[in-house]
Amino acid sequence: MDIQQNKTNKQKKKRNRFIFRSSILLILVAAVVFAIVSNMKDDNKIYRVGDAAPDFQLKQISEEVDQSTVQLSDLEGKGVMLNFWATWCDPCKAEMPYMQDLYAEYKEKGVEIVAVSLDGTELVVDQFIDEYDLTFPVPHDKNGEVKDLYKIGPMPTTYFIKPNGEIEEIVQGALTLDRLEGYLNDIAPQQN
């Protein structure tokens, strides 16, 4: 009987291990399915040309600008160039002088340039603003919330937004002066 009882005990242990392992596997599969379904929700939308640009509000760094925050919805009725950049990004540095050169002219035409800094600290951004004599709004996305909202990958990335809030164009990489001017013309409010 000892042999029979030993066999029965081994079978019970095997069955218990099988049930335990199956339960763990089922829990893991359920967790993976939940994670996939959660990531498919609308808050993970990738914005494309023709979509409405999502609203945001960020603290303003540039002292040249009157307001202390920049909120996209406050610029309704104007064309908006929304540029995502960082001080360590060489292509970003290359296009900043073009943006500054065109800012005053296009501000009069109803186009606002907003350069969202993705740097970690305000100090480096403030020094950059002084070095390049930037006079357009430079809000700071310290925590990356707006970067995540717009799904920004490579820098610079620029959204050109029509006066009605619709995305006209998305450009990844540095802009030349000619391309920049062309896009700014495309989003300028129509003069009647």
From Swiss-Prot:
GO terms for molecular function: antioxidant activity; disulfide oxidoreductase activity. The gene is resA. PANTHER family: THIOL:DISULFIDE INTERCHANGE PROTEIN DSBE. This is Thiol-disulfide oxidoreductase ResA. Disulfide bonds join 89-92. The chain crosses the membrane at residues 22-41. The keyword Membrane applies. InterPro entries: AhpC/TSA, Thiol-dS_OxRdtase_ResA, Thioredoxin-like_sf, Thioredoxin_domain, Thioredoxin_ResA/DsbE_sf. Keywords: Cell membrane, Cytochrome c-type biogenesis, Disulfide bond, Membrane, Oxidoreductase, Redox-active center, Signal-anchor, Transmembrane, Transmembrane helix. Pathway: Protein modification; cytochrome c assembly.
